Structures are given as C-alpha cells and as structure tokens.
Amino acid sequence: DNFPHLAVTKAGVARIEDRPPLIYHFDTEATKDYKIHAHSAFANYRGSLLPERRALIESYMLSDIAFKVVGVGSVGTFCAIGLFMTADGEPLFLQVKQALPSVLEKIAAPPPGLSHQGCRVIDGQRAMQAASDIFLGFTEDQKTDRHFYVRQLKNRRLGSIGEVIEGKALDAYASLCGRTLARAHARSGDPALLAGYMGKSEVLDDALASFAMAYAAQTKHDHAQLKAANDTKAGLARK
C-alpha cells in the first residue's frame, strides 16, 4: 500500500521515481515553483486533521512531490502525490487533488462554513463512508487561492473486479454496489425523505437503468473515437 516501488533514493534523499507520462516532476519553467507552494500547503493540511491523527502525521516529513495523472473526473485540475518519510525511512504517499466549486453553487449558495472547497469534499466523504481515510484532510495554496483535499494514495480498487468476475456473480456484485451506494446516501441525507422521493413504483429503477445503458453506449462510442484517433496518429508516425 505504501508504493515502495515508487520511492527511490538519490544522493541519500528519497524521491518519487518518474513514470512518464503518468508521474513526473515539476521540472519545466511553468511548474518549477510548485514544490515551494506544496511544502506550505502540506503544512496547512496538518491542521485539518483530528488531533490524534495530526500527532501521527507529525512523524513524517515531506521528501518529494510530483504530478500524477489521474481519472477523467480530475482532468484540468492540479493533482499530485507527495512522498513523506519517517526518520527511520518508512514511506507514506499522500495524494493532493484540487477541489473545484460544486455545480450546485450555480443555483444555491454553499452552506455556512463550507466556502472551502476541499473542506466541502471531505465533509461529504466522511458523511458517506462508514470508515474514511485517517489522513483525509484539506488545504489551500494561498498564492493561487486554489483549494485541495488530501488523502492516502491507494492501489487497492474493487472497480476492476467487474472485468474478471464470473457472469453468475455479476448480479450479486452489482447488488452489493447498489446497497453500498444507497447506504452512503442514507448516511448523508434524510432516509425517510429519500424513500418518499423514490416511492414504491419502478419509475426510479427504470430511470437508473436507462441512464446506465445510455452511459454504457456513450462510453463505447467515445472509446471507438479514441481508438480511431490513436490508430490514425500511429499511422502518421510510421510514415
């Protein structure tokens, strides 16, 4: 979980190994000053943790930081990973991701006390998750006035299980995902209000199924276009 394969030692200093184009350092003219901002941002991040977790993170020092390419939901935002080390050489990777304003702010003002976008994100995660990341926190870059949330870098995901799961078990897996999502929303909202909105008919069920099918069709269409563009580019490169 601590990604030891990403940590290398150079001249006695632990650094993140470049894995371009997915992981790379701030070496260009446009990004050279981000590391200085990152040290300040991570210092502010510690203050967002609960006291007992703050004491734990204090045993780590920021050793290196690098850009990390993540999922499509974060395209166009600042995403990086920080390598923290203890005095005896134990690594900890934290991920810092830019938090943008909620789309709901276009129609309604944010609740009092939630003007910090990173704080808003982690409050939602803590409400929806039965057990959240112990290092989940938030910070900001005061020079650019951008907000971020911070969490541990994870390499254990269940999303890819759908690619290898047996057909007979897929229905049970989908049901488990649905129950988990429903439980999360019930934790973060009013269960009675949600139940009343959904009703007892199959209208919502049909709407969700229709959305899922349309989303799958759009994904296939987008992938076909991406593959065609990639094949065209590869053909031009060979010429």
What are these regions (language model features)?
Residues 1, 43-239:
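Conserved ATP-binding subdomain of kinase catalytic cores across diverse folds
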Residues 1-31:
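Internal, well-ordered alpha/beta segment that forms a basic, Gly-enriched binding/recognition surface
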Residues 24-34, 116, 166-167:
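General structural signal for secondary-structure boundaries
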Residues 33-39, 43, 47:
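ATP-dependent kinase catalytic cores of phosphoinositide-metabolizing enzymes
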